[in-house]
């Protein structure tokens, strides 16, 4: 993990953006930290009351993200999928990630992908935004979704005014 090319951990002025956060209950220690960081990121960006819902696992994220996308301007999916001894890891990681992408494409609502796909618990802990973590994927996914929602708001506003995007 180099973090090379990662944008600065900035905030955006997202006042008025409705944010939904769907988070898995698997690997709760990791995901709970990501939820806390996502909420903190949202508040730092001016979103005071994000909707937060919990689901069983990563595979349940896309359908709940779809429902959230119908009533929110941006959605974030958070989970930690940790490799085990069987190929199940690949199936879950790919299906959940592709599902979130499909929600964004089908609804036109940005969906921040905060699904950690790690080879070990140590890798997950290093990415979940704990005080000694090297990365903060809950924060990053949230700011990315809010930033995209603002871009879409601007593009749609321009289109409604007859201006080029």
Swiss-Prot record:
Active site: 88
Keywords: Riboflavin biosynthesis, Transferase
Pathway: Cofactor biosynthesis; riboflavin biosynthesis; riboflavin from 2-hydroxy-3-oxobutyl phosphate and 5-amino-6-(D-ribitylamino)uracil: step 1/2
Cellular component, GO, one term: riboflavin synthase complex
Domain of life the protein comes from: Bacteria
CDD domains: Lumazine_synthase-I (cd09209)
Chain residues that bind 5-amino-6-(D-ribitylamino)uracil: 26, 58-60, 80-82, 113
Database matches in PANTHER family: 6,7-DIMETHYL-8-RIBITYLLUMAZINE SYNTHASE, 6,7-DIMETHYL-8-RIBITYLLUMAZINE SYNTHASE DMRL SYNTHASE LUMAZINE SYNTHASE
Name this polypeptide is given: 6,7-dimethyl-8-ribityllumazine synthase
